[in-house]
């Protein structure tokens, strides 16, 4: 993980670790935070990746500081990459985490 990703992990963890169903797993070359066995959020190249409803993909992509999530050369619908400028405050970071947790909790547990 890059130093930026390690710093983001340290910022994410307090907002998610006390929630029921929380776990961590190495993924995407870094660390992802899981809820009930489903990938939820994590750092990636200094940005925050969040799992959201695929049906709202286009709407999410139009938000400020949001880029398509593309690890393999193909856009991953249902995921958003939030640039560092979009999570400068803890309130902004928590809001993205809360959105991802709400969505992921709607999925069947793994």
Please give the residue ranges for each predicted region:
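Charge-dense, helix-prone N-terminal extensions
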Residues: 1-110
């Amino acid at each position: 993980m890059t130093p930026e990703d390690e710093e983001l992990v340290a910022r994410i963890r307090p907002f998610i670790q006390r929630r029921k169903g929380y776990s961590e797993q190495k993924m995407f070359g870094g660390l992802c935070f899981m809820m009930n066995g489903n990938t939820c959020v994590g750092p990636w190249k200094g940005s925050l990746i969040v799992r959201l409803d695929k049906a709202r993909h286009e709407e999410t992509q139009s938000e400020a500081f949001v880029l398509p999530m593309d690890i393999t050369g193909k856009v991953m619908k249902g995921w958003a990459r939030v640039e560092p400028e979009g999570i400068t405050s803890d309130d902004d970071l928590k809001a993205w985490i809360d959105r991802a947790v709400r969505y992921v909790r709607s999925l069947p547990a793994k």
